[in-house]
Every structure is written in C-alpha cells, then in structure tokens.
C-alpha cells in the first residue's frame, strides 16, 4: 500500500477526436484525499477536451467517476480536491459527471484518467493529469 505521493495519470497527445484511457495507478489503499490537476498545453484547433478521473472499489472490475475537468481552445490548468472522508448519504449514480464537477466520499485503491476530445487539435496539444494522494 502506497501511503501517498504525486502520480502521473498520463500525458495525452490530443489530435483527432478520440477517447483515450490512461494507465492505472494502483496500490492506493488507505487514501483519504486526492488533489487532481489537469493541464492543457494548447497548440491549435479543436473544440473541447475533458479529463475524467475514475476510481475503483473492486480492483478494477468497474470504475466510478470522481472528477471531470473541461477545456476548450486555450491552455489552462484546473485543480480539484476529492475527499474520501465526506459522508455519502445517498448512493452515487454511475455515469457521466457534468462539466467541471467532482464527487466526494468515494476513493478506492486505484485511479485512472480517461480523456475525451472533440474536433481536431493540432500543434502538439497535450493534456497532462496528475494526482497527489494522501
């Protein structure tokens, strides 16, 4: 079990419209909070791109979305913190989070990022996603 640290969830090259799934960072059992950072290094073109960060409560069999960070056609960085200590008094619904939202109260033992883009980006556009786990 990793007790904390900063982990890369991927550096995604953005070109034609696509969905990309990053590598899994696992062995995070015991995490109580995660600060997520997504940075779009914008080149040119494109329409929209967003990163969804997911966690798993069943060793990667299924995934729960815990944050979504959205970008359009300019470089930017967005940061959000998700707490595993926030009580959930109602069941979270699996599915798509709305733009620029997060879901507190749910942190599993692994994370991954999924990046979805529309339009065609060019000029070495990259979306980088990091997680600081504690």
Q: What annotation goes with each model-predicted range?
A:
Residues 1-134:
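Surface-exposed, low-hydrophobicity beta-strand/loop segments enriched in small/polar/acidic residues
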């Amino acid at each position: 079990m990793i007790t904390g640290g900063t982990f890369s969830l991927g550096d995604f090259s953005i070109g034609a419209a696509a969905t990309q799934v990053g590598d899994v960072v696992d062995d995070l059992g015991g995490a109580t909070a995660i600060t997520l950072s997504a940075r779009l290094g914008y080149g040119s073109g494109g329409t929209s791109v967003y990163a969804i960060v997911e966690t798993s409560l069943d060793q990667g069999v299924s995934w729960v979305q815990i944050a979504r960070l959205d970008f359009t056609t300019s470089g930017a960085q967005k940061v959000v913190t998700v707490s595993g200590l926030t009580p959930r008094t109602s069941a979270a619904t699996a599915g798509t989070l709305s733009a620029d939202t997060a879901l507190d109260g749910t942190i599993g033992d692994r994370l991954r990022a999924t990046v979805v883009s529309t339009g065609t980006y060019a000029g070495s556009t990259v979306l980088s996603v990091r997680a600081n786990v504690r």
